[in-house]
Amino acid sequence: MALFESCTSEQKNVLKKQILKLEKGITKLNHWVREYEFASITYEIEFFKTVKPNLVSNYLYLNLLLRLLQEVPNIAFNDLTVYKKYSKEAYTFLKEENYFYNYLLNNDSCNDELYFRRLETTLNYYSPNHLFSDIKSTCSHGLLTAKIKAYEMWLIFCNNKIQTIKKQYLINQKSLDSSPLVWEAHKVDAIELVYALYFGGAVN
C-alpha cells in the first residue's frame, strides 16, 4: 500500500489498475465460493469473517485513496483540513456502527454463526442491500467488516499525513526563527523606505 500513500496524481492510473485487479480477484472468489462446500462451520466462519473481508477491505481502501486523488488538487495535498475532513468521515462511520465495531475489537464470537455464515443459511438480511446479494457467496456482516477494516487503514493514513504536515510546519517555523531578516542595504535606503510607507499611508 505504501506505493500509493504518497498521493501523487501520477499514480492515479497505477492505482486504478490495482483496483481493477482486486475487483477481478473478488469476482473470481465469489464464483468459487458459491459452489464450495466448507469442511466445517468453523472454516466457513473464518472465510467470511477474515479471509474475504481482508481482500475486500484492501479494495475499499484503495478506492478511498483514488477518491482522494480525484477530489483533491495537487496544491492541497499538504492541506491539514483535507485529512481532518476525511478522518472525521471515518470516525463518523465507526461511531454509527459502534456496536459491531466493538464486537470485532473485542474478538467476540457469540454471534459468529449468525453474522458470518452464508445468507443462504442464516437469512440474516442485516442491510436492505442484501436483498440483491448472492446468498451463496455473501454473509450478513462480511461487507461491514471489510468497510470497518478499510476505514481503520484510512484513519491511519490520514493521521500519518496530519502528523507529517504538522512536523513539516514546525521545521519550517524553526528555520524561519533561526534565520531572522537582516537589512543589508544602506541606512539611507531604509530611511527612504520608511518615508515612502509613511507618505503612502501604509503606516501611521
Where does each model-flagged region fall?
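Intrinsically disordered, low-complexity acidic/Q/S/K-rich activation/interaction tracts characteristic
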Residues: 1-174
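Basic amphipathic recognition helices
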Residues: 170-203
